[in-house]
Curated annotation (Swiss-Prot):
UniProt gene name: NAC025
GO biological process: embryo development ending in seed dormancy; plant-type cell wall modification involved in multidimensional cell growth; positive regulation of gene expression
Subcellular location: Nucleus
Cross-referenced InterPro entries: NAC-dom, NAC_dom_sf
Organism ancestry: Eukaryota, Viridiplantae, Streptophyta, Embryophyta, Tracheophyta
DNA-binding region location: 114-183
PANTHER family: NAC TRANSCRIPTION FACTOR 25, NAC TRANSCRIPTION FACTOR 56
Protein's organism: Arabidopsis thaliana
Region (Disordered): 201-223
Designated name of the protein: NAC transcription factor 25
Pfam family, one: NAM
Length: 323
C-alpha cells in the first residue's frame, strides 16, 4: 500500500553538489521560498516541486518530490471546503489531514511576522472515525500583510473570492514520524548534547553520593573507635583506680593469680555478652583482703612479676591517706 521508492531521484531532480543537505529553518522557508513563489520571483534553487498535494495520499508523495530522502517539500494550492468559506478542504484520496495543536507564527530577524506554520496528521478513512497514521505535514502560509495583491487586477481578486481557490500557494513539508531515518543532523546533534549533559549530571551526582557515603562511613568508624577507646580506657582506669591497692603479703599472691587467670584469657569484642559476664565474675572474685598502702601505691609488682606481668606503679596526686 505504501510504496516508498527512492525519493531522492524524482522528476526534474536538481543537479546539486555532493554533500548538499536541504534543512531550512521556518523563516528561510517562508522568506526565501514561499514569499518569492507567491511574488513570482525566481527561487534560490529549484528544489521544491509544484503539486496539488491533496490529490494524493501521503505515501505517494515521496515519488513526486524533486529532492529529499526522509522529508519532502512541495508547493501546493489550497481550495475552500465550502464556497465563500474560509476553511480549507483537506480531504485526500483515501483519508484526510487533520490539524493538531495551535498555529505557530513565524517571524523574521527583525521581529516582523511573515507567516504561520500549522501541523497536521493524516487519518485514513472518513471523519470522524478515521484511523490515525504516522504521516505528518507542516503547512506554511503567508500572513495577509505579506500577500502580493497590489499588482493583481481588481477583477482577479473578485473572481478569486467567488471561486474555491483559497490560496494560490502554500509550502508543505511531509515526513513519516516513525521513520528511523527521520531525524535530521541537527536533531542528532541535539540528542547527543542532551545525552552528554544527562551523563555528566548523573556522573556528578554519583560522585557526590560516593563522597558523602565515604564521609559517613569514616565518621561512623571514627565514632565507633572513639567510643571503643572510651570504654577500654574507662575499664583500665577502673581496674587501676579500684584494684591497684596495697596488699598484705598473704593477699598479693592470690590477687596476682586472679589477674593472671582473668586478665589474659579474653580475646573477644568489648560488646560481646561473654565478655560482660566475665567482667562481672572478675569483679566478684577480687580478693577482699586487699588494702591500701600509705602512699596510695598499689603493691602488686612482685606478684604480677611472678606471673610474667609487669605494671609500673603510680601515685594518685593530691590524695592524703593519713587523714
Amino acid at each position: 500500500m505504501e510504496n516508498m521508492g527512492d525519493s531522492s531521484i524524482g522528476p526534474g531532480h536538481p543537479h546539486l553538489p555532493p554533500g548538499f543537505r536541504f534543512h531550512p529553518t521556518d523563516e528561510e522557508l517562508v522568506v526565501h521560498y514561499l514569499k518569492k513563489k507567491a511574488d513570482s520571483v525566481p527561487l534560490p534553487v529549484s528544489i521544491i516541486a509544484e503539486i496539488d498535494l491533496y490529490k494524493f495520499d501521503p505515501w505517494e508523495l515521496p515519488s513526486k518530490a524533486s529532492f529529499g530522502e526522509h522529508e519532502w517539500y512541495f508547493f501546493s494550492p489550497r481550495d475552500r471546503k465550502y464556497p465563500n468559506g474560509v476553511r480549507p478542504n483537506r480531504a485526500a484520496t483515501s483519508g484526510y489531514w487533520k490539524a493538531t495543536g495551535t498555529d505557530k507564527p513565524i517571524f523574521t530577524c527583525n521581529s516582523h511576522k511573515v507567516g504561520v506554520k500549522k501541523a497536521l496528521v493524516f487519518y485514513g478513512g472518513k471523519p470522524p472515525k478515521g484511523i490515525k497514521t504516522d504521516w505528518i505535514m507542516h503547512e506554511y502560509r503567508l500572513t495577509d500583510g505579506n500577500l502580493s495583491t497590489a499588482a493583481k487586477p481588481p477583477d482577479l481578486t473578485t473572481t478569486r473570492k467567488n471561486s474555491l481557490r483559497l490560496d494560490d500557494w502554500v509550502l508543505c513539508r511531509i515526513y513519516k514520524k516513525n521513520s528511523s531515518q527521520r531525524p535530521t543532523m541537527e536533531r542528532v546533534l541535539l540528542r547527543e548534547d542532551l545525552m552528554e549533559g544527562m551523563l555528566s549530571k548523573s556522573s556528578a551526582n554519583s560522585s557526590s553520593t560516593s563522597v558523602l557515603d565515604n564521609n559517613d562511613n569514616n565518621n561512623n568508624n571514627n565514632e565507633e573507635h572513639f567510643f571503643d577507646g572510651m570504654v577500654v580506657s574507662s575499664d583500665k582506669r577502673s581496674l587501676c583506680g579500684q584494684y591497684r591497692m596495697g596488699h598484705e603479703a598473704s593477699g598479693s599472691s592470690s590477687f596476682g593469680s586472679f589477674l593472671s587467670s582473668k586478665r589474659f584469657h579474653h580475646t573477644g569484642d568489648l560488646n560481646n555478652d561473654n565478655y560482660n559476664v566475665s567482667f562481672v565474675s572478675m569483679l566478684s572474685e577480687i580478693p577482699q583482703s586487699s588494702g591500701f598502702h600509705a602512699n596510695g601505691v598499689m603493691d602488686t609488682t612482685s606478684s604480677l612479676a611472678d606471673h610474667g606481668v609487669l605494671r609500673q606503679a603510680f601515685q594518685l596526686p593530691n590524695m592524703n591517706w593519713h587523714s
